[in-house]
Amino acid sequence: MSVVVATVNTEGGISLVADSQVSDPYSKLNGYPDKIWAEKDSGYVIGSCGSIRTAQVIRFATDWPKYREDEHDLPKFAILEVVPAIKAALQQHGLLKDKNGVETMDSGFIIAWGENFFSIEEDFSVLMPIKGRIAIGSGYAEAYGALGDEGMWSLDDTIEAVRRSTLTAHGVGGDIYFITTNELAIESVENV
């Protein structure tokens, strides 16, 4: 249970913003900043919702493919190169699941770089941002409601969408962290 929101930023690039609450069936903990991170070698920024273990394996064990605009279109790259790289890391660490004959994972992700972004869902389906924004996790509906359909959005707009999700969505809370494809550095909203 979480919320991660990515938007096309009015200042260029993509903003990725997340809450910091993690939970298990018996408790919750606020202040976990590792729902978002930067893969500095590839220039990707990534946000995750779901299993912490799955996110850790994807973060530290995935051999990220390099996107080259002259060789790939974005959906094809995501489906044929990124998804298999993630599946390979999960398989290697025993986290690739089979649900009624469909390979699954217990997390969802947003991956962004430059002006590009998409989400990978639990069944490895890839969703492209139709209106310049993507939200995942239990707070996604509140975030979409706060953003509306007309973008681009400032970083502050995206932070506000996550803040609103912390007020009403189950399993969303704690401090808010952000990263942009321009900066590749995680910051707390308190430090802005």
Question: What residues fall within each predicted segment?
Answer:
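C-terminal catalytic subdomain
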Residues: 163-170
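Long, charge-patterned amphipathic alpha-helical coiled-coil/hairpin "stalk" segments used as oligomerization
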Residues: 102-135
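Conserved short S/T/G-enriched processing/targeting/catalytic segments and their helical context
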Residues: 1-96, 102, 127-159, 172-191
